[in-house]
Amino acid sequence: MLTAAGVSAVDGNYRLRAGIWGEFLDSLVMHYGGSDSLKTGWVSNVLFEPAVGNDLFHRMAAAEPLLTVKHGTAFVDARREKGRWIVRTEHAGKTETVEARVLIDATEQGDVARALGVPYDIGMESREATDEDIAPETANGIVQDLTYVAILKDYGHDVRIARPEDYDPALFACCCANPLCTNPREPNRVWSKEMMMSYGRLPGGKIMINWPIEGNDYYTNM
């Protein structure tokens, strides 16, 4: 999420500099020249360019002698055998087998856990199950909106491309306050374009567009 997905703004834990997070944060500070250099937008105190974060994660991984990173690897299946995990993957067109005492599912959607029959829920749990006031009274299957984040660069001059044939400005008319916004879905949350652009401003003249107000959230369901 912090690199390839473009959401290079970290929520909270600014003062809990420990473990992998502490190592990554310290590396960002060294790269940009200080903690204040990461406070470029108002959504977070830790903002950075995705490419920089990607480079730092690769350096951290490369420094570990017992860690092997294989990009472009897909999970096939796993089984438990004589107290060990036997995991099959596909890499570079070939099937590979890994044996381990511990298996951690770090896939985005829990592919390994699902394949092994681990119970799971989809959607919002009920208030009775969580004892949280913010939860719905009854459970439902609604999942969090998908977001296609965009990283823009401020060139300091007009670099607009030719208007695409199917472009419909009405879809995003109310992402911020402007004359085209006449019927907003959330009248109390129509903020200025300056607020939208400064929300995820990154170092290096970049801007993260991760805007939930009639912006780039895409609602769908399972």
Please place each PLM-identified region on the residue numbering.
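Conserved N-terminal/central alpha/beta ligand/cofactor-binding core
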Residues: 1-77, 81, 121, 144-149
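Flavin (FAD/FMN)-binding glycine-rich loop and adjacent Rossmann-like elements that form
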Residues: 2, 71-72, 91-102, 106-222
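Generic structural signal for short, solvent-exposed loop/turn connectors between secondary structure elements
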Residues: 14-16, 77-84, 156-167
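Mixed-charge, polar/low-complexity N-terminal
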Residues: 42-43, 48-50, 85-86, 181-182, ...
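Conserved beta-strand-loop-beta-strand element in the redox core of flavoprotein oxidoreductases
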Residues: 79-97
